Regions:
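Carboxylate-rich, polar loop motifs that coordinate divalent cations or form catalytic acidic clusters
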Residues: 1-224
Length: 224
């Protein structure tokens, strides 16, 4: 009898090929198909056949099918499902990558816990800081012991979930604050459930909220 290789799952991701990816705590990355499941665990840094850290915080799959894995202290890992191999990046080696999204076709935007937001170049593996509004707001938001959750909600807009809900317009390079903790929602850094069309759903572990990008409105749709 074969049992599931992990007890605690932190993230789930269903890719376009209907494969389920489970990011576990201390048991690595688990790929699940209708017929089998395979797991990948940590290996020495730079090894092609495993993760740089066995706790997974986040995923993103790009248009080429590459899965970008955010680990808890081992930075960003690139996983090629076709070859079954990984690539680790020295510039992100010790980062705790809480959330990760596409920024441009060649770049990713990620949040490193208690360190800040960074843009990662997929080809060079180098990173550079991304400032949330200005230095004061960036430090208040990103270096305070809380997570910042990120979601690409349209082709040109990114949502940041923290003590405020920020919307970044990639064309104008301007931010809007559309909600604030203690007013529109109760707890810090609501988890982003999903984006469906113009609507993005979030949970602060008590209530469920909705941001409508077509109207620019934020509201609570379920009170727990």
């Amino acid at each position: 009898v074969h049992s599931f290789p992990a007890n605690t799952i932190y993230r789930l991701y269903l890719d376009p090929a209907n494969n389920m990816w489970a990011g576990s705590i201390r048991r690595g990355l688990i790929g699940i198909k209708n017929v089998y499941a395979c797991s990948y665990q940590n290996v020495p840094f730079g090894n092609l056949y495993g993760l740089s850290n066995q706790t997974i915080n986040s995923f993103f799959q790009d248009s080429d099918g590459i899965v970008w894995v955010g680990t808890d202290g081992g930075g960003i890992n690139r996983f090629d499902p076709v070859s079954g191999t990984f690539k680790h990046y020295p510039a992100t080696k010790y980062e705790k990558v809480v959330s990760i999204v596409e920024y441009t076709p060649d770049e990713l935007l990620f949040f490193s816990f208690n360190k800040g937001l960074f843009i990662f170049h997929k080809k060079t593996g180098q990173i550079r800081p991304f400032v949330l509004i200005d230095k004061e707001m960036n430090d208040q938001t990103c270096i305070n012991g809380f997570s910042v959750n990120i979601q690409r909600i349209t082709k040109t807009k990114i949502l940041f979930s923290a003590q405020h809900i920020f919307i970044y317009d990639m064309v104008t390079r301007k931010f809007d604050i559309v909600a604030t903790m203690g007013e529109e929602y109760e707890r810090h850094s609501p988890l982003i459930i999903a984006t469906k069309g113009a609507k993005t759903y979030l949970s602060d572990l008590k209530n469920i909220c909705e941001y409508d990008s077509s109207e620019g409105t934020f509201r609570t749709i379920y009170q727990g």
